[in-house]
Regions:
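A short, conserved alpha-helix in the catalytic core of glycosyltransferases
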Residues: 118, 183, 188-189, 198-217
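A conserved acidic beta->alpha catalytic loop
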Residues: 40-53
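A conserved hydrophobic helix/loop-capping motif in glycosyltransferases and polysaccharide synthases
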Residues: 5-14, 21, 28, 41
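Glycine-rich, basic loop-to-helix element that forms the pyrophosphate-binding segment
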Residues: 80-96
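Conserved donor NDP-sugar-binding/catalytic core segment of glycosyltransferases
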Residues: 109, 113-155
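Short aromatic/hydrophobic "clamp" motif used to bind/position activated sugar donors
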Residues: 101
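A recurrent flexible, glycine/aromatic-enriched loop bordering the glycosyltransferase active site
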Residues: 86, 162-184
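Short, acidic, metal-binding catalytic loop of nucleotide-sugar glycosyltransferases
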Residues: 23-35
Length: 217
């Protein structure tokens, strides 16, 4: 079966986050994993964490000392050392080999059915110019944030909000901005981060507004 969706993440010294996110995808979304490729962009591949991520991907056998068949079927481990920045996540869209891409942080878990629902959305709207995001679930697994409000809060632009009515309705709805721990789009419609961006943060509102200026929401 041809892969439909790339799920990719960038990492910098977070083997545990990569491990748990990928294993959760494989365990709790197994019904669609044959349609998914998984990639990791490692921004510090020579560190202890980087070496462990590579071993996890390539199936390192501690008994034989050999790399074996790999622990992530169809997965690709991609070292990237040209520069170090949170915006390396944008390379997920450049490396993806499918029409649709989901970029997420390497500590994010998705509720069962979420990947299937995203694939169904793209089946229905394969040319969409929209940026797709989702709610943030609280640790109690009962409460949610649905979006960020475009206002300043504690020296950060963006204040968490919850639209109860639209959330309970269950249909996709437009939001002003959101955190960028998870976002998705059609690969050919990815608008990209500014190539001069470095460091951490600042993509919230920027990337949503850029999609709006290119005809999406």
């Amino acid at each position: 079966m041809k892969k439909k969706l790339t799920i990719g993440m960038a990492t910098y010294d977070d083997y545990q986050g990569v491990f748990w996110t990928i294993q959760a995808l494989r365990m709790y979304h197994a019904e669609v994993m044959d349609q998914v490729e998984i990639i990791v962009i490692d921004n510090n591949p020579d560190s202890d964490h980087g070496k462990e991520v590579r071993r996890f991907f390539e199936g390192y056998d501690t008994d034989s000392g050999l790399f074996t068949h790999g622990n992530v079927p169809g997965g690709r481990y991609i070292p990237f050392t040209e520069y170090q920045s949170a915006f390396v996540k944008g390379r997920v869209f450049e490396e993806a080999q499918t029409d649709f891409v989901l970029c997420l942080d390497c500590h994010v878990f998705l509720v069962p059915g979420a990947v299937r629902k995203l694939i169904n959305y793209y089946d229905a709207f394969p040319k969409t110019k929209n940026l797709i995001q989702g709610p943030l679930i609280h640790d109690n697994l009962r409460n949610y944030f649905t979006h960020l409000k475009p206002e300043w809060n504690d020296q950060m632009f963006g204040n968490w909000g919850f639209d109860k009515e639209l959330m309970e309705k269950g249909d996709p709805f437009e939001i002003p901005m959101n955190g960028c721990g998870l976002f998705s789009c059609v690969r050919e419609n990815w608008v990209g981060f500014n190539p001069a961006f470095r460091g951490f943060g600042g993509e919230e509102w920027y990337i949503q507004e850029k999609f709006r200026k290119h005809g999406g929401v």
